[in-house]
Amino acid sequence: MKAASSNAEQSSHDKILDAAEILFAKRGYAGVGLSELAEVVGLGKSSLFHHFENKAQLYAAVAARILGRIEERLVRSLAKGGDPIVRLERWLDELIDLLADHPTYARLLLRSLFEDDDLPGDTPEEQEAHRAIAGMMASVGALVREGMAVGLFRAANVQHLLLTLVGLTVFPFASGEFGAEVLGKDIFDPAEVRRRKRELRDLLRFGLVANKGR
């Protein structure tokens, strides 16, 4: 009986996160009310508070879940081995696949960057989100430095490069109508996803990789 109750609890928890992810990605932190969210999930507002104390905690939990999934892909990708070029390209390919498979991810992640000021900063969920970001930036930064040390990557400012990689991967999948207008196609179309991978690989090969690493 306890197991069934625990499973039901987890199911409700996940349903709340799933619905919140869609709404927050579409309208942002300020544009979503907990009463509306409870109605979408089919719960009373008091039941919603049983899972999350407030909207800030819920928002941080949604972001932390997305970042955790991205981090999981990064760890798995880097563990497959290969030189720094191969590992970086593989990781970026997997990140693009993940963003393409989950249209809410990129938009919510970009929103969270400038909506962070609305959050108190002290919830476990926020701390977990910040830990995931710091961990991923450290891992990719170490990979880039390794490539520079062995002469595969040209000398570059690693911090600026990390910001560039975030922009190159995340922004296109959050660009909405603007992106569709620029491309003339839907970025989530499988053919465009493949093209995005090729374009990013070429940018790396001709912008970051040293001549002898090409």
Enumerate the language-model features and the residues they cover.
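Helix-turn-helix
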Residues: 11, 15, 23-57, 61
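All-alpha amphipathic helical-bundle segments outside canonical DNA-binding/catalytic cores
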Residues: 86, 128-132, 148-166
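C-terminal peripheral helix-coil segments that are non-catalytic and often amphipathic
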Residues: 1-2, 97, 101, 134, ...
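Short alpha-helical scaffolding segments that buttress acidic/His motifs in well-ordered protein cores
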Residues: 92-95, 109-113, 165, 169, ...
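Amphipathic alpha-helical segments used for helix-helix packing
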Residues: 101-127, 176-183
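Short, basic, alpha-helical segments at the C-terminal edge of helix-turn-helix-like DNA-binding modules
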Residues: 64-69
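Hydrophobic alpha-helical connector segments
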Residues: 61, 75-107, 133, 158-162, ...
